[in-house]
């Protein structure tokens, strides 16, 4: 399509004016489109024009950096497809989708969209049922309408043509610039410093809110690589191994002689005690079994690294003894880091002659469990397909079915059994009326109708979870095989958008997580755990314990020999029982936003041990006489094999 002429002028003059006008339009579009896209992206996340404009005017240099990144993406897409309008439309669609995903993640679990979320292809579909509210659908519809209008401009706007060589060179420059932003090349570091960029790695919601989505997302690319701790070296690990050998010695001497109980870990989906909510009452006790065990048995509270989701990260901490605190915020080890055998509780018990079995009542591919469990040394993995005609409650297999599978697994083995079971029934969201209107436990208190419905649905599931625990206890009370059950939730449930139930009840004072006190942060990450056994064990109360220290604690209670790394965990937990990225709790119960100086050296050793095992040279195995990483997880070279019908 030719540029239109201008009447009353000679043809050559009209053509020249038209070209000048067209060139001006191109320049304006190349500058204006990225600015508008950044404003739109931030508007999606911030919710109002006022909040977006306030951020823009207070942080105009950050706004310009976000626009520069979007400009590079826009030009790169143009270099690929060669159409200005199509590039604008595709850029708008792509970046709007990223903004929407980040918006929903923040609303539901308090985390923005990270670079590594791109690789959660199947898992990402799990968010679809969560975005069907009217407000969400309006946002999605509006975005697609705007993109459609942009594409319509193709009918009137002439095609901007550049020679293929020019497009290749320009595209390569864009890729180089984006890569430089991702790895923070020196020239980018200088640019960011001059703009006053403050990367808030310990609080990613604040990081995105302050720096803008495009810039924060790009800065997180470099965090996909876990850096080597400054003090990590073979001499350092050899010295640490020597002290660990001294710890392991007494532990071995105190180990229970010859008794090998069945050890059953049950991580119940989103299990939490709803009676902890203030200003809310229930028609009956929703979790009587857990409340009874809190009085009769060892119990306490686990400090979870997650809220509302990210179940596999809790598994990672419990099964390996490693901490999410030393990995990039928002990362998923099951997807990103575990691609080879790694020592775990499964391989530990397998080495003692146990059958190590994993059970999960959902898809085996979810969070890459099928592969990860093999690397951890599980002998078998029963996923959703391994359940024979199971009962469903709502959309998911009932927790009772998991309890029955646990019993069947133990009964079918001649050797003692280690089981790690993960339930699914009470997965959120809870505004779906999955059980109909007949909720056995009624809720009263300072909640609106929507929040009350959400809480009643959740409580129904928590009640079923509690009942499924009692089913196991009833069975193993009659068993002659010594058995211990460790029952806990992976994280608190996401009870509505913006922590709705928690805010309305007064459990927290605001939906803005970056404004929570340390006490509120602790409450929002503390889940109850209980232990039960059919043999005598002294009762203990545990005020706080990180998930990464749970395995070492259980082995201590069983008086079983601990691997060197878990021996260190046991000692560290006496000084720092609670360790999250932005919350540290010491042995006196004092809360800190970061590791106190008195424990910094000990925590750094923990970081070095984790790096050595996951990414380093496995010096610890060399100097403690422990099996190598591969042998620890797969001592016979077989790995995990699915049960019949399982994954």
Give each language-model segment a name:
Residues 72-73, 258-260, 479-481:
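Short hydrophobic "helix-edge" motifs at membrane interfaces and signal-peptide entry regions
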Residues 109, 117-126, 138, 215-225, ...:
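Short alpha-helical interface patches
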Residues 182-265:
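Membrane-interface segments at or immediately adjacent to transmembrane helices
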């Amino acid at each position: 399509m030719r540029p239109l002429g201008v009447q009353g002028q000679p043809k050559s003059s009209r053509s020249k004016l038209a070209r000048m006008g067209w060139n001006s339009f191109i320049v304006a579009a190349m500058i204006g489109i990225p600015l508008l896209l950044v404003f739109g992206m931030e508007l999606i996340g911030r919710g109002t024009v006022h909040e977006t404009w306030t951020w823009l005017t207070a942080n105009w240099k950050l706004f310009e950096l976000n626009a520069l990144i979007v400009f590079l993406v826009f030009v790169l897409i143009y270099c690929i497809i060669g159409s200005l309008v199509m590039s604008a439309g595709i850029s708008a669609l792509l970046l709007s989708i990223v903004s929407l995903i980040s918006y929903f993640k923040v609303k539901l679990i308090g985390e923005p969209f990270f670079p590594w979320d791109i690789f959660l292809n199947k898992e990402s579909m799990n968010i679809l049922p969560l975005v069907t509210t009217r407000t969400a659908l309006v946002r999605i519809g509006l975005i697609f309408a705007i993109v459609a209008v942009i594409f319509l401009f193709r009918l009137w706007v002439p095609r901007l043509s550049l020679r293929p060589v020019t497009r290749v060179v320009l595209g390569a420059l864009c890729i180089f610039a984006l890569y430089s932003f991702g790895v923070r090349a020196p020239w980018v570091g200088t640019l960011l410093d001059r703009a006053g960029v403050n990367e808030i790695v310990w609080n990613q919601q604040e990081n995105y809110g302050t720096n803008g989505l495009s810039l924060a997302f790009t800065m997180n690319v470099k965090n996909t690589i876990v850096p080597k701790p400054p003090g990590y070296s073979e001499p350092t690990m050899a010295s640490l191994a020597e002290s660990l050998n001294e710890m392991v010695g007494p532990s071995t001497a105190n180990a229970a002689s010859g008794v090998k109980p069945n050890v059953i870990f049950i991580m119940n989906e989103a299990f939490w005690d709803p009676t902890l909510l203030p200003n809310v009452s229930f028609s009956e006790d929703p979790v009587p079994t857990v409340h009874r065990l809190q009085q009769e048995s060892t119990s306490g509270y686990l400090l979870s690294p997650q809220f509302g989701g990210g179940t596999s990260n809790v598994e990672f901490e419990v099964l390996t003894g490693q901490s999410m605190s030393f990995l990039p915020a928002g990362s998923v080890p099951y997807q990103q880091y575990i691609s080879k055998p790694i020592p775990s509780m499964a391989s530990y018990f397998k080495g003692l002659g146990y059958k190590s079995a994993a059970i999960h009542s959902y898809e085996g591919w979810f969070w890459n469990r099928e592969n990860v469990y093999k690397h951890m040394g599980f002998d078998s993995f029963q996923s959703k397909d391994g359940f024979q005609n199971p009962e469903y409650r709502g959309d998911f297999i009932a927790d009772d079915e998991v309890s029955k599978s646990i019993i069947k697994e133990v009964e079918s083995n001649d050797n003692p059994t280690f089981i790690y079971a993960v339930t699914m029934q009470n997965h959120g969201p809870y505004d779906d009326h999955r059980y109909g209107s007949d909720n056995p436990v009624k809720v009263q208190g300072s909640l609106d109708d929507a929040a009350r419905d959400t809480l009643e649905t959740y409580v129904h599931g928590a009640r079923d979870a509690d009942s499924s625990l009692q089913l196991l206890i009833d069975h193993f009370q009659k068993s002659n095989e010594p058995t211990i059950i460790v029952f806990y939730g992976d994280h608190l449930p996401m009870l509505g958008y913006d922590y709705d139930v928690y805010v309305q009840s007064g459990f927290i004072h605001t939906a803005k997580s970056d404004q929570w006190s340390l006490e509120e942060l602790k409450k929002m990450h503390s889940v109850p755990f209980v232990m039960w056994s059919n043999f005598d064990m002294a009762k203990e109360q545990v005020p706080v314990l990180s998930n990464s220290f749970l395995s070492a604690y259980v082995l201590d209670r069983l008086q079983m020999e601990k691997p060197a790394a878990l021996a260190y965990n046991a000692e560290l937990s006496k000084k720092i029982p609670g360790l999250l990225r932005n919350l540290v709790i010491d042995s006196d119960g004092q809360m800190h936003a970061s590791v106190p100086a008195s424990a910094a050296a000990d925590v750094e050793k923990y970081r070095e041990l984790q790096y050595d095992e996951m990414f380093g040279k496995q010096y610890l195995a060399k100097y403690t006489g422990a099996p190598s990483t591969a042998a620890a997880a797969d001592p016979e070279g077989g790995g995990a094999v699915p049960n019949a019908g399982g994954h």
